[in-house]
């Protein structure tokens, strides 16, 4: 075990040593913050652009009625859809007041949600386990996705529901056997994710296979926006934090990731074809409840806020 710790410390030493940033940076005014939303005039999902984090929304479906109303289908259109969105942003038309809309998850029906376990050096140190030599892959079902302010429901089957703030990225271009040097061509952007986890089902039941503990309904809040990659300074050097009832429980930086975006795409695409709309959850930093002494788990009445610099924050009540 001492050897494992030394290996992890060597990896930590070689990682970027930028300290976690303290405040959420505001994205540039003309950033592409793609959202799905409902308005007071229409209960059906629509595609929009958030003018800034927490700002008003450009209704892309009003700007161009030929655009699909769901993000996956929008991304399947490829570069033409993004160019239309940029034109809408430049036009400054069809703006809806934030008070008249409610945000949904930026994507609600991906073909795949690919999740990475133990992908932060400091999270491996927290568990006193070796840093993985290959990505550890598991998944969630799309039925677990909820929006940036929707409730997280504690299932009757679990007494050990835990928090995990994560950086997520979304595929924008189909590919198989993708090389690392080409991987970013397949990424459309990034968002904030919360990999809610039932530790009893993940670690003690179901043969310790992770799926059931990870994929209860409401166990994948996403949002607030899908921020296109071109306006993010460096996705692998962003402060990432989680707060439970206002208390800071996770505080790290994405530079602690063992496998970055490019490596994850190259690895996963060896096994499966990646399609537009597929979501990757890239792992969580230290500070989760299960490894506290004594362990701490979520309960009804809690509020969990996950935030990442340049992307924004999601805040979900627990019921």
From Swiss-Prot:
Keywords: Isomerase, Magnesium, Metal-binding, Mitochondrion, Transit peptide. Tautomerase that converts enol-oxaloacetate, a strong inhibitor of succinate dehydrogenase, to the physiological keto form of oxaloacetate. It is thereby required to maximize aerobic respiration efficiency by preventing succinate dehydrogenase inhibition. Belongs to the FAH family. It comes from Xenopus laevis. GO terms for biological process: oxaloacetate metabolic process. Residues 1-31 form a transit peptide. It is found in: Mitochondrion. It catalyses: oxaloacetate = enol-oxaloacetate. The keyword Protein transport does not apply. Mg(2+) binds at residues 164, 166, 195. GO terms for molecular function: metal ion binding; oxaloacetate tautomerase activity. It is an enzyme of class 5 (isomerase). Requires a divalent metal cation for activity. This is Oxaloacetate tautomerase fahd2, mitochondrial. It comes from the Eukaryota. Pfam families: FAA_hydrolase. The keyword Metal-binding applies. InterPro entries: FAH, Fumarylacetoacetase-like_C, Fumarylacetoacetase_C_sf. The gene is fahd2. GO terms for cellular component: mitochondrion.
